[in-house]
Each structure stands twice: as structure tokens, then as C-alpha cells.
């Protein structure tokens, strides 16, 4: 589609306020659950596939425009699978000097931990679906944890509520440790959400821009893990995705509280990603982990509260006490009007 046509469609979209006369609905097909706000946003969730967000679409001039890379595609694609794998209990690589990758040590015993953790590999089940005049939501619970109990010897429940509102999608993760655990349950957390680049049919992948005001960039060692090296960010303010290294993660942090990152498509569409937790790990903590491939056409602005190898180093780790409860909320907000205030002008 030509740029002029897309911009016209966006103008048509703006002629009706987002969320006007919305009638929220939930449908299920082939194991996937679709939340629709009856107006302009639709989200698809995949309980059998790690409980992940499998699709996120906006409606422009009566047509749905999918923004997620490889949305609802559960074939065997070559390369990155896309969508939005949930990273728990250890985003990134776990590494020990003696055993190498995919290992961690608890109470002196070496245990296995796959890259990005095991939650994305498990089946989740639907616990509740609900529609009101203000939202549609589905709550999923992770199952199959006993298969990993030798490597992660804790009892707990882990749920996510996908809540579609009139103007945004909210993900609410809840971790509750069993009161029978004999000590704190350590974990870190992330979401590998991956968007198409460009999201609409305008411009090139490298023309997508992102904005952050995080002062720090956390560097990885040759082993792929964070070992304490922090430098001033090389990506302040507005930056093109083309400035990011090819398929090499850029880890940003250095600020506490709610974390935000903006993404702007060449079409004029923008997304605001924000996340916050009921309690935070002590710094250093990666707040957003950026990963991109402009040749394949995707950009992952991943919300994290973690560092690579957190189970071994303790950096970015959340120690949840027996009987404790912890929540993490992510908001994904689309828009086409003026960008949210950033305090800086784009080039």
C-alpha cells in the first residue's frame, strides 16, 4: 500500500474516537482466545503456546492491521518465531563457569535452566473469561511446572490476565509462592514481544524509531551474560531501529519505577509500552531489552525486570518469600495522534 493511502486511512481512523460505543467480546477458535473491544483493537492469546500474546491488531477503515511479527503462526518457521514469548524464571542465558550455558546453582547443586526460562515451553489453561462495559479479559494459569521441579524446586502458582480496554491492552502477571516453600523463591521476568517492522506498509524496517530516557546500558560478556559492566547509553532519546546492532540485544536501565518506551512507525502509528511491578529488584536491572533484525523485518522492545544470568548473580533477581504474592503489569497503547510527551523533539 502506498504511503499516501495509509496516511489517508489513519486520518479516517481518527475521525471516530477510539473506543466509541465499544461492545467488548471474547471468542475462541483452535485453542486461541480473541479479545475485541468492539471498535479498534483486537488481541489474540495462545494458552497452548506458553500463554503468550499471539496477535495484536488495530482496525483502520474497517480493516484489521496486524502488528505482531508472525502472529498466530505455529508452523515450524525458520529463524525467530516472533509473537511474545513469556520469559520466566530467568530471561536471557543462565551460565556457570564450570558447567557453561543453561545451568544455575542453588544450595550448592547444579541445575538446568534453558534460555529465557521454561514458562514459554509449557501449556497454560484458561481460568476465567469476562466482559464488562469497560473491558474484556481472559486469565490463564501455567501448568506442567512439576516437569521442571528438579531444576526449579519451588511450589507456586503463576497467572496472567490479558485485559483489553478501550484504548490499550494490559497484561497482569501474578506470581504467588507457596507458604510451604522452605526459603525465598528467586526469579526474574520479561516478555519478548516482537512487532513487525515497519508495522504498516510504509517505509523500511530501519525507519521505525524508538524513544527512551534510560541513562544506562548494561553490557554482556562473551558468554552472553551481564557481569556488572555499565556504560552511559549509546541510544538516548529518539533513535532509528537501524542504529541497533543486528540481532544483538541492547539492554537499557538505570531508572526506578514505571518504565516506558515509545515506538513510532513511518506511517505515523505509535505504540507506548510501559511496565511496573508491585516491588522491584535492586539495581542493576534491565528495564527494556532491545533486539532487532531489519532484514527479516522485526523489532523486539522487550519489557524486562532482570539481567542475563540473574539466578546465578542475583542481579535483577526477585526473592519471593514463602506465601508471598508479586504482580507485574505491562501496558501496550497504540495511537495515531500527537505522540505522548517526551520532552525532546524528533529530528
Give residue spans per PLM region:
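Surface-exposed acidic/polar loop and edge beta-strand patches at domain peripheries
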Residues: 22-172, 178-347
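Sec-dependent signal peptide recognition
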Residues: 2-11
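N-terminal signal peptide c-region/cleavage motif recognized by signal peptidases
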Residues: 15-17
Amino acid at each position: 500500500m502506498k504511503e499516501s493511502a495509509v496516511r489517508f486511512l489513519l486520518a479516517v481512523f481518527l475521525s471516530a474516537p477510539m473506543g466509541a460505543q465499544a461492545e467488548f467480546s471474547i471468542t475462541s477458535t483452535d485453542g486461541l482466545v480473541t479479545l475485541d473491544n468492539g471498535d479498534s483493537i483486537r488481541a489474540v492469546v495462545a494458552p497452548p503456546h506458553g500463554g503468550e500474546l499471539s496477535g495484536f491488531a488495530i482496525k483502520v477503515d474497517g480493516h484489521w492491521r496486524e502488528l505482531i511479527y508472525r502472529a498466530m503462526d505455529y508452523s515450524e518457521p525458520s529463524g525467530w518465531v516472533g509473537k511474545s514469548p513469556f520469559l520466566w524464571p530467568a530471561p536471557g542465558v543462565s551460565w556457570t563457569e564450570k558447567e557453561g550455558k543453561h545451568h544455575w546453582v542453588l544450595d550448592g547443586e547444579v541445575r538446568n535452566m534453558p534460555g529465557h526460562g521454561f514458562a514459554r515451553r509449557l501449556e497454560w489453561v484458561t481460568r476465567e473469561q469476562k466482559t464488562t462495559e469497560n473491558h474484556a479479559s481472559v486469565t490463564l494459569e501455567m501448568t506442567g511446572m512439576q516437569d521442571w521441579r528438579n531444576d526449579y524446586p519451588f511450589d507456586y502458582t503463576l497467572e496472567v490476565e490479558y485485559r483489553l480496554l478501550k484504548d490499550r491492552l494490559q497484561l497482569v502477571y501474578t506470581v504467588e509462592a507457596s507458604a510451604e516453600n522452605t526459603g525465598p523463591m528467586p526469579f526474574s521476568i520479561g516478555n519478548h514481544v516482537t512487532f513487525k517492522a515497519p508495522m504498516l506498509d510504509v517505509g523500511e524496517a530501519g525507519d521505525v524509531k524508538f524513544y527512551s530516557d534510560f541513562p544506562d546500558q548494561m553490557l554482556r560478556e562473551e558468554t552472553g551474560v551481564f557481569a556488572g559492566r555499565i556504560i552511559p547509553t549509546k541510544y538516548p532519546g529518539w533513535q532509528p531501529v537501524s542504529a541497533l546492532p543486528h540481532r544483538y540485544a541492547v539492554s537499557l536501565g538505570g531508572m526506578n519505577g514505571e518504565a516506558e518506551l515509545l515506538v513510532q512507525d513511518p506511517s505515523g502509528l505509535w505504540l507506548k509500552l510501559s511496565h511496573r511491578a508491585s516491588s522491584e529488584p535492586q539495581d542493576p536491572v534491565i528495564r527494556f531489552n532491545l533486539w532487532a533484525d531489519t532484514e527479516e523485518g522485526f523489532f523486539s522492545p522487550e519489557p524486562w525486570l532482570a539481567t542475563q544470568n540473574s539466578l546465578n548473580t542475583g542481579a535483577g533477581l526477585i526473592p519471593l518469600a514463602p506465601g508471598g504474592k508479586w504482580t507485574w503489569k505491562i501496558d501496550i497503547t497504540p495511537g495515531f495522534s500527537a505522540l505522548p510527551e517526551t520532552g525532546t523533539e524528533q529530528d
